[in-house]
Amino acid sequence: MSNELRLEDNYVPTSDTLVVFKQLMKLPVTVLYDLTLSWFAKFGGSFDGDIYLLTETLDLLIEKGVRRNVIVNRILYVYWPDGLNVFQLAEIDCHLMISKPEKFKWLPSKALRGDGKPYVVKLQPAKFIENLQTDLAKIYHCHVYMFKHPSLPVLITRIQLFDSNNLFLSTPNIGSINKESLYNKLDKFQGKPLISRRPYYVAFPLNSPIIFHSVDKDIYARLVLQSISRTISERETIIFKPVQKIPVKSIHNIMTLLGPSRFAESMGPWECYASANFERSPLHDYKKHQGLTGKKVMVREFDDSFLNDDENFYGKEEPEIRRLRLEKNMIKFKGSANGVMDQKYNDLKEFNEHVHNIRNGKKNEDSGEPVYISRYSSLVPIEKVGFTLKNEINSRIITIKLKFNGNDIFGGLHELCDKNLINIDKVPGWLAGENGSFSGTIMNGDFQREQVAKGGLL
C-alpha cells in the first residue's frame, strides 16, 4: 500500500494555472532560464526540438530583452501544456525561498536523545528522502524534495502531502482510525483527484542539533515532524523539543541567531567578538594600530538630520560630546563603533548578485523592491519579543511585562537613544539585543531565557 501512495517526480497534480503563473512571475529571469533547461533535460517536454535548440531559443529571447511573462507563458502553455509535475512545483517553491527569504517564517526545535542530551542531526540526503517518503506513504500520498542552500550551510526539505478530499486531515478523531478502516477509505477515494496541502519545510543546519521548520502547528505539521523523528531514529529514539515560540522571518536570520554561527551567542553589544572586530590581529601591520595612529574624530555623514543638530531633547550639545555619545550608543547596540551597515550592504549586494543577475552578467532592472539600510539596522532584525521583569521590593514580588513589536525592535531603541529620549547608561544588555530573538524573565537583573512547554514531538 505504501508504495502506491508515493508520488513520483513526474506526477502532475491538479493545480491552478493562474497561481503557478504568479509564482513563476516572482522568479528572476536567470532562474526561469535555468529551470526550463534542467526540467527539459530531466522530463522532456512539448518543445519540437532537442535541448540545444531550446537553449538557442531561450538565449535569443533573452538577447531581445523579452519580458518575464513571455518566458513564463512558454513554460506553461508551450513546453508543458498538460501542467507542471510535483518536482517542478517543488523547485519553484524552493527557488522562491532563496530569492525572497523574508516571505518564509521559521520556528526552531532541538533534537534530543532519550537521556535529554542534544543530538547532532547528520543526514545522508538520498537515504533520508527514501526513508521519510516510505514512512509518510503509509497513510498519505506524498512527495519529498531536498536541496542544499546555495549560500548557507543548511539542507532544506520540502514535504507535501496529498489526499482525495482532505478526508484524513479534517477528521477530528484521526488518531482512532484503525488500519483496516483507513485502507478502505483510501481505496474508496483513490480514483478522485488528489488535493494538496500547503508544503511543509524543515531545514537541517550542518553539524547542529537545532532544526528549523514551518510555523504550522496543526495535526499535519505534527505528523510530519513525528515522521522525521522516526526516520532519523536509527539506533535510539530522537525527539524534537521546541526552542522558542516566536517565529523568525528569513532562513538567513534564524541561521544567524540559532544556527552553527558565532553570532548565535554574540548578539547586541557582543557582535564584535563574533566578527572579530574587537582587536587587531597580531599578524596585522602594527604601524597602523590605533594606539600609534590615533583615532579619527570625523563622523560619517548620515541622512538623519538630527545627528548634526546641536539642539537635542535636553538642550544644546557640544559636537564632540555628541560624537562620543552616538559612538557609545552604536557600541551598545551593534558591538562596534562602525556598526553593521557595511556588513549588511555587502551581504545584500552578494545576495542580489547571486540571485537576481541575468545569465549574461547584465543587471536585471526588474529584480524586486529596493531595500533600505540605515545606521540603525540590526544585523538580524527582531520583530517580536517579550520580557517579564520581576523584582523583590519590601518582601513582595513586583512583576512588569514588556512586549515589543516592530520591523526592527532593537534598531528602534537604538534610534531613541541617539535622539536622547532614552539614557543609554540605563539600558541593560537584554534591552540592547544581546539575547537575540529570545524572550525571557529578568529576575533581579539576571536574564533567564523563556522555557517552552515541556515535552517534545515524538
UniProtKB/Swiss-Prot annotation:
UniProt keyword annotations, A-Z: Cell cycle, Cell division, Centromere, Chromosome, Kinetochore, Meiosis, Mitosis, Nucleus
Subcellular location: Nucleus; Chromosome, Centromere, Kinetochore
Gene3D superfamilies: 3.10.20.720
Gene Ontology molecular-function annotations: structural molecule activity
Chief location category: nucleus
InterPro entries, per database record: Chl4/mis15/CENP-N (IPR007902)
Biological process annotations from GO: attachment of spindle microtubules to kinetochore; cell division; CENP-A containing chromatin assembly; chromosome segregation; establishment of meiotic sister chromatid cohesion; establishment of mitotic sister chromatid cohesion; kinetochore assembly; maintenance of meiotic sister chromatid cohesion
Classification via Pfam families: CENP-N
Keyword Signal appears in the UniProt entry: no
One GO location term (cellular component): nucleus
Additional free-text comment from the UniProt record: Present with 606 molecules/cell in log phase SD medium.
Functional description taken from the UniProt entry: Component of the kinetochore, a multiprotein complex that assembles on centromeric DNA and attaches chromosomes to spindle microtubules, mediating chromosome segregation and sister chromatid segregation during meiosis and mitosis. Component of the inner kinetochore constitutive centromere-associated network (CCAN), which serves as a structural platform for outer kinetochore assembly.
Subunit structure: Forms a heterodimer with IML3. CHL4-IML3 is part of a larger constitutive centromere-associated network (CCAN) (also known as central kinetochore CTF19 complex in yeast), which is composed of at least AME1, CHL4, CNN1, CTF3, CTF19, IML3, MCM16, MCM21, MCM22, MHF1, MHF2, MIF2, NKP1, NKP2, OKP1 and WIP1. Interacts with CTF3 and CTF19.
Homology family: Belongs to the CENP-N/CHL4 family.
Protein name: Inner kinetochore subunit CHL4
The species this protein was found in: Saccharomyces cerevisiae (strain ATCC 204508 / S288c)
